Amino acid sequence: MLKIQPARERRAGGKKLALALAGGGPLGAFYELGALHALAEAIEGRELTEFDVYVGVSSGSLLAGALANGIDTTAIGSSFIHDEATIPFSPDTLLQPALSEYLGRMARLPQSLAALGRQFMREPLQGWPGVVGSLSNVVPTALFDNRPLERYLHEVFSSPGHSDEFDRLRSRLYLVATNLNTGESVAFGDARHSHVPISRAAIASAALPGLYPAVKIDGEHYVDGALIRTVHASLALEAGADLLICVNPLVPYDASGVRGKRRRNLAEEGLPAIMGQSLRALIHSRMHVGMASYGARFPGADVLLLEPDRHDERLFFANVFRYTGRNRLVEHAYQRTRRDLLSQADQLSRALGRHGLTLNRQRLRDRRRTFATAGEERAARVRRTARRLDHALHRLEALLAQGRPRA
């Protein structure tokens, strides 16, 4: 669904563009990839890799870091979906057991048992609650290791033409994490934290407690940035954004039933479905409170919000760890976003036009387009441009050679 919050005031110029990407785990990242690809081909006048400000939270930090580095959605798709990139991505990267965490916690067991024994001697009738409390520091804090993801991101961002340093980017990039010991949000990429590698900041922003361990940076431990706020879009607006596009992949699933379909009872779907729905409800309600305040706080900015439909069963129950699941989810998000953009084309065109952008309606109406074919078309345009540039360089070299004095 597309929600448009037009500016209450008009500012001169008005061409500073920003993109804010919320989190949502692997599922959210693949949804955002499809939605962003639809945006990239529909909006003309500026590439998504040419925006002025990027904000990433949780899994959104991975995509924000890539776009700020000039890596477009076609290249991201080649890596994440088709395994065709120079540095391909495997979902196994996200599921490596946190062995060092397990071993480190086990090493504490003798000391904890000794402390428990001393406590039992003092209070022999304390019961099981006291035992469990005494051994809590032995329980691993995470299931999976986020260091393989950090190594992958560092390799990608350090490749030729890119950078793993905030200060070397053309645009401003903010990746938001939560300080575990203070409960405060930290925006890596601001003046105080721009020395941190982008790859390190990204895994800190995406360190969901229980799944991934907290990330230590400058003596502090950081976890998922969505614990405090969902999108942190105000960072982009405070940086002077005139047009802000937000993508939020997590909305509560409405299981009340779509016409012609049997109602699904989430209570029967197991713990992951119940926890997922609870998290979505919390994140979504909190985000809309923040979005509602932007009109008064930043009256000169147009704000666009893209979200999935609440009845989208395919998105809620998708399995992103299977190749077909990833491919279908990205394609599904791509087509749904194209539909949403076209359904509000008139209002969207006016909002984009205020910032020197246009909406390609013909491309949105083309039902033959898919995520894959759109990517191939975009790659073909890049190749044609590269060939023209190569031809121009050869001609320039020939002209320079003709002008050189002979020995």
Model-based region annotation:
Residues M1-V57, L62-A407:
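Patatin-like phospholipase
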